[in-house]
Amino acid sequence: VATTAPYSEPTAETAAHLDEIWHTPHTLYGRLATVDHKIIGLRYLVTSFVFLVLGGLEAAAMRAQLAQPNLHLLSPEAYNQIFTMHGTTMIFWYAAPILSGFSNYLWPLLLGSRDMALPRVNALSYWLFLFSGIFLYSSALVGQMPDRGWFAYAPMTELRYSPALNMDFYALAILFLTISTTVGSINFLVTMLKMRAPGMSINRMPIMIWSTATISLSVLFALPSLSAACIFLFFDRRLAMHFFDSAQGGSPLLWQHLFWFFGHPWVYIVVLPAMGMASMMIPTFCRRPLAGHTYVVMATIMTGLIGF
């Protein structure tokens, strides 16, 4: 049973106007301002791969330092910074964004829609993602990269233990990234609900749509705690609000509660889209329909719920 409005053929005038709107001008501004889902998806993939390379180089630097005892390739401060940047890059700027790239590219094709439901929001999500990564790595220009681990446990992130700007870069960069991920998740959910082709009912949606929609909903519940933790950390350091300072009535455990409320479902947020893609590719190459489609959907949703 179709759950969307019946298809209507546009007039020639309307079709010409829509083609003009959807056309991407072959200029620098046109390419930068494009809202085409395929281009944005490819940008996610390329940018995520760049961050993968950066994270890999950081891992190689750490392994080189540990290759033999008593090497002095990195100072203790530089090692802590590279260790933190490696974990932060791989977890936040590669693992999830690479899957966003695939989803941005494939979702409209799978749903039979022209584009994502909110194309400009889609573009905003990418540019915020890119800006947050550039902002994080700009800390290297002043020699103050984050240095307290990718999990940034309090109280080591307090101003008296980390007086430079290291953890300020961390808190603000992740805050920008959470905004990017949140608006992107909203876009995915709206696209699923409003942009399905005629005849594409909920129970006919491909598994990849279900898996990405599940993690998009998880993101909307999980990321606010991380955003709040980063705001508290920045306020702690720059406005002396003492959220994590036990000497002033705060609690270092508050950071862990907020961070891991996000961290536990994040594992499944990263895994489920990949499982969704595998659940589409394997039946395709086997030339067989997916066995137990309904049960796979139920398992996907339950995995997202249990992640919390």
Features from the language model and the residues they span:
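Membrane-embedded and interfacial regions of multi-pass energy-transducing membrane proteins
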Residues: 2-308
